[in-house]
Amino acid sequence: MCDRNGGRRLRQWLIEQIDSEQYPGLIWENEEKTMFRIPWKHAGKQDYNQEVDASIFKAWAVFKGKFKEGDKAEPATWKTRLRCALNKSPDFEEVTDRSQLDISEPYKVYRIVPEEEQKCKIGVGNGSSLTDVGDMDCSPSAIDDLMKEPPCVDEYLGIIKRSPSPPQETCRNPPIPDWWMQQPSPSLPLVNGYTGYEQHHSGYSQMVITFFYSGRLVGHITTSYPEGCRLSLSQPSNHGEKLYTPDSLEHVRFPSAEAIQNDRQKQITKKLFGHLERGVLLHSNKQGIFIKRLCQGRVFWSGNTVVYKDRPSKLDRDEVVKIFDTNLFFRELQQYYNNQGRFPDSRVMLCFGEEFPDTVPLRCKLILVQVEQLCVRQVMEEAGKTCSSPMLPDDVQQEQVYRIFQDICGPHQRPLFRENQQIAV
């Protein structure tokens, strides 16, 4: 069954605002309350009144946590946010023949699409895709709608650069070492992968990186350099860039956007690429996975160290962030064996250019990158085979977890990635 709780959030909120009659111009279009008008005056008009004409857009920004009193007012950004949310949502459909945009008080008309009209599709297309995204789905034309009005693309990419980060914890953690600004250890191999690296650590240093464009699997790689990797569009070419990319770092490139079949999805993805040129740095060790954002475009993430799991988490530029805690993963796995918790998630998700997590289903995200530690992923596979009887004695369970970990993270590691891998987020 397909459950679009994310879409319901916008739908229910907007219906409540219309019924409140607090926003000038936001009214029902018909008695059946299946269509509504929303004011659409351009901010450049002489008679534009921000308090009136932008009130519903501001309310959405406040509701989403993107604006609070005292912040700089950005009515154009507020409007773009709500417009793109409406265009992406399968719950709404613009009724263009009823909209009036060339009058003194312009407005658009949207129809609330009945649930029975909304088809829950399992996949975006043939081949590997995000076939299980937390029981969420989206209209196949969601990103197409985003591209209908050419200005929306530039404004949308403007949001990518302008939006503030969500509130962070008041008590900050101790600073994390910046491995990329340190000299690589001479005991580690710099070119030939992890051959000479300590066997106890080799499984931690390798990462499995999987790329999804608009929900479709477009590429994957298992890294082998113990110092980490740089994920970007091209090889660094100037001296300044090389300061961030020592020779010991493996270079991992984003797959080409040419793999995207839909022309408009391809167009906006290429535009987004323009803001991701410098990419991000990734490092994995016994403690976990760490990232450093270098690119201009925003990067959002989810992992087992995220503070707020129900709101977007943005990476600050040039700051090293721990996005996966290996010890926490194994503690949660032990709790699962003790029948005291859920099966832990081994994955980190990176979303480039778009807020994440939010109400937009994952299939509508332009660029998603999944990152996992190689040995932890293999532990998950083995644990999934052996955890069918969670009522084993505690001492047996602890020994079982230890044995699985030792077998997988030892010197003889087996290949991980399966070509038909599907991701459940």
UniProtKB/Swiss-Prot annotation:
InterPro entries per record: Interferon_reg_fac_CS, Interferon_reg_fact_DNA-bd_dom, Interferon_reg_factor-3, SMAD-like_dom_sf, SMAD_FHA_dom_sf, WH-like_DNA-bd_sf, WH_DNA-bd_sf
The entry's localization annotation reads: Nucleus; Cytoplasm
Matching entries from PROSITE patterns are given as:
IRF_1, IRF_2
Gene Ontology molecular function terms on file: DNA-binding transcription factor activity, RNA polymerase II-specific; DNA-binding transcription repressor activity, RNA polymerase II-specific; RNA polymerase II cis-regulatory region sequence-specific DNA binding
Keyword list (alphabetical) reads: Activator, Cytoplasm, DNA-binding, Nucleus, Repressor, Transcription, Transcription regulation
Check the record and name the SMART domains matching this protein.
IRF, IRF-3
Any single GO BP term: defense response to protozoan
Q: What is a single Pfam family found in this protein's UniProt entry? A: IRF
Primary location: nucleus
Signal peptide position in this chain? Answer: none
CDD domains listed in its UniProt record: IRF
DNA-binding region residue numbers: 7-114
What does the entry list under GO cellular component? cytoplasm; nucleoplasm; nucleus
Q: Does the keyword GTP-binding apply?
A: no
**Similarity remark:** Belongs to the IRF family.
- PANTHER family attached to this UniProt entry: INTERFERON REGULATORY FACTOR, INTERFERON REGULATORY FACTOR 8
Role: Plays a role as a transcriptional activator or repressor. Specifically binds to the upstream regulatory region of type I IFN and IFN-inducible MHC class I genes (the interferon consensus sequence (ICS)). Plays a regulatory role in cells of the immune system.
Supply the name of the protein: Interferon regulatory factor 8
